[in-house]
Amino acid sequence: ETSGMTRYYPKYYRQTLNSIKDSLDILQAQGYRNIELSAIYEGDPSVWGGLGATNNYAIDPSIGTLEDFEDLLREVHARDMRLTFFGNVGYCWYKAPFFEKACDDQRNGVYSKERNWFHFSDKKLNDNWFWSDRAQAYYYSCWGNSDGAEGRIPSYNFNNWEWQEECRNYLDFWADKGVDGILLDAPEVYDGITDDIINESIIKVLNRRGILTNAEGASNIEKWISRFDFKLIQGFDMYGWGGGKRSEVLNARRNQNPCELNGKLKSYRDRIVALGATTITPPMWEIPATNEERLFELAYLISM
């Protein structure tokens, strides 16, 4: 089965869970069978729609409550639709209470699980290390130099067993709510990640529940599909976002040369399908386009 999926950024666009619930009949009539909610937990919406959490286990009060979320999920399932949760176990928001505690414990030399969830250093080892007055040390942030981030998204330390355990708790919590899919933000670049850690801390948790998941930005397609049994792959062969905005579909349309897409389809989409998985490729809304160009882009992506 295939259908369109529509993604919501509730915190960023100030949409409540109840307003999304009220739109379900319209979405169903339009042919959507899956809705995706991005970063609905507590967190500042200013960077990437709020992917950096301040509380991984609570709905952001600006969009509703856990009860509202559970009600929305029931209404989605009552219509034979699916709900996918886009979350993040790679980094948090720098004002998260648990990161502030980690900084305090680092400064005071106190052992704690929160302190061990992050990487601290007395030295600036490279440009991904940012100074914290509170910790009196540098902390690691993989995406800290990205547009708008400015070091405000400290990375979790996957090389630490206490964070691995917390990651499993996080995934279990949202899976227990009954979501149908959990999409993860760029797992290949989690701090300290290895294949074994991914398998134990993420894959086994989701696979034992039969939950759909997606490796955003996956480069080694064969590994993610064949070894980790991912059924949905969101790579960047057809488009790029953030600091590298790119749409191969729009480029081909503007150059009046559809042959430009052949190589991309063979090297990316066809490989994924041959391995038994599905691609997820959204329109590149960050690139301005005419109505005609946007319709062409949408039609092409739907046909993939």
Place the predicted regions along the sequence by residue.
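Substrate-binding/active-site clefts of carbohydrate-active enzymes
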Residues: 1-33, 39-177, 201-208, 223
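Generic low-complexity segments that are intrinsically disordered, proline-rich and/or Lys/Arg-biased
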Residues: 11, 259, 283-284
